[in-house]
């Protein structure tokens, strides 16, 4: 199917962020390099990754607060919201845009978020924001900054020298 169907811009960012969330460095770098070959803009890819991490962080906080529970049926995850009014309010304020979307996307993001601690996601988000700022400086090539970010995030904080 991948050979016959042209990916949309949203699916390109989603696929890259998915391999990042799975901490699959070879697949992540392979996909990133393919996207660079296809002349995708590193800045736009980074924006997609930032949004993904921000959503995962919000979902992780909801999981830790007990507002969101995950149950598994094989490889499928089923998110269940608490019936408490404060849970609904928290969900609406943190991930209201996800609640309006397809439930599968919410389930996939919640599953990914459950594989991280809040501290990890906060560090990842901080590093993407720092990289975003460095992209605007223009001192280092955008693709090199992005590749170093991907390596650093997946390897767990060991800084790539740029």
Identify what each model region corresponds to.
Residues 1-11, 19:
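Long, charge-dense, solvent-exposed interaction surfaces that engage phosphate-rich ligands
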Residues 12-15, 19, 27-162:
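C-terminal alpha-helical interaction modules of replication/initiation AAA+ assemblies
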């Amino acid at each position: 199917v991948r050979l016959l169907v042209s990916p949309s811009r949203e699916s390109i960012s989603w696929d890259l962020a998915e391999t990042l969330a799975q901490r699959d460095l070879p697949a992540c770098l392979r996909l990133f390099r393919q996207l660079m070959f296809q002349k995708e803009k590193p800045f736009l890819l980074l924006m997609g990754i930032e949004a993904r991490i921000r959503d995962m962080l919000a979902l992780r906080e909801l999981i830790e607060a007990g507002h969101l529970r995950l149950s598994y049926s094989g490889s499928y995850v089923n998110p269940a919201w608490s019936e408490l009014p404060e849970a609904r309010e928290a969900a609406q304020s943190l991930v209201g845009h996800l609640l309006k979307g397809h439930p599968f996307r919410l389930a996939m993001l919640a599953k990914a978020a459950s594989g991280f601690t809040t501290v990890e996601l906060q560090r990842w988000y901080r590093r993407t924001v720092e990289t975003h700022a460095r992209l605007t400086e223009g001192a280092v090539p955008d693709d090199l900054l992005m590749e170093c970010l991907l390596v650093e995030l997946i390897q767990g904080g060991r800084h790539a020298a740029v």
